[in-house]
């Protein structure tokens, strides 16, 4: 079986600077989030690969045309809860229903904002078939989850699809590592994991490929220009495509 690459994106209100201490934008980052999403569709068009897009219902309501275009491009549309505000009701069922209505396609996947832990029974009861909120690693200042399983598995009648981590040391290959590591080293780690598991699950945010002027955003993210960050992502996708096949999460699980 050909190795699978699950490239996933969290499409949300632009509140990343606020996460790092900046003053929240007046509209919670809604208008900037729409602009970044539109720009991401332009950037990703050249890749010609399917991915999985977890979008908040609030952003989907603000840009239903972009939501439909995302699905028409061959991407799976999934739920990222109702909004990206911290510590609020995720409205699991309501967000799934609203995104389904706006997208005109069934929504079966869920990822919580900031990978917040949500009981899988609640996710399943809301009508989802899989949850992608697990990053089974140590992320300083965020969480310690090395006891969680590393590969997709059924739990409480629902699929759990963890983000990829290096075995044994549990080093995460999530979005931050992409910016922190030299690209050849990051690619080598991805290839190692594909050889080991036959699967690579990555997640990023469209805002990572946008103009980042806010001084509160850490230097390790904004040290490269927007053009350079896009170029690195283009290179990553091109190189990974030589080792595996890009698929949506739903297609991979067969749900």
Segments and roles (model prediction):
Residues 1-162, 166-168, 185-255:
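Catalytic alpha-helical scaffold of carbohydrate-active enzymes acting on polysaccharides/glycoconjugates
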Residues 171-184:
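Binuclear metal-dependent hydrolase catalytic cores centered on His/Asp/Glu-rich metal-binding motifs
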């Amino acid at each position: 079986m050909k190795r699978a690459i699950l490239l996933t994106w969290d499409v949300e209100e632009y509140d990343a600077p606020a996460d790092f201490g900046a003053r929240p934008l007046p509209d919670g980052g809604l208008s900037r989030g729409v602009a970044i999403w539109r720009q991401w569709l332009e950037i990703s068009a050249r890749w010609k690969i399917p991915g999985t897009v977890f979008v908040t219902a609030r952003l989907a309501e603000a840009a239903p045309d972009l939501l439909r275009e995302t699905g028409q491009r061959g991407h799976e549309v999934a739920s990222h809860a109702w909004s990206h505000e911290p510590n609020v009701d995720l409205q699991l069922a309501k967000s799934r229903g609203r995104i389904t209505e706006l997208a005109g396609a069934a929504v079966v996947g869920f990822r919580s904002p900031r990978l917040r832990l949500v009981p899988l029974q609640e996710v399943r009861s809301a009508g989802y078939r899989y949850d992608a909120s697990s990053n089974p690693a140590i992320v300083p200042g965020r969480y310690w989850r090395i006891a969680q399983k590393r590969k997709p598995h059924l739990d409480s009648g629902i699929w759990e699809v963890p983000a990829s981590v290096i075995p044994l040391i549990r080093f995460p290959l999530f979005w931050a590592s992409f910016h922190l590591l030299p690209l050849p080293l990051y690619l080598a780690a991805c290839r190692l994991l594909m050889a080991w598991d036959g699967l690579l699950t990555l997640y990023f945010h469209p805002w990572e490929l946008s103009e980042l002027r806010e001084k509160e955003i850490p230097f390790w993210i904004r040290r490269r220009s927007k053009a350079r960050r896009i170029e690195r992502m283009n290179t990553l996708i091109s190189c990974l495509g030589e080792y595996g096949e890009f698929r949506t999460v739903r297609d991979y699980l067969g749900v």
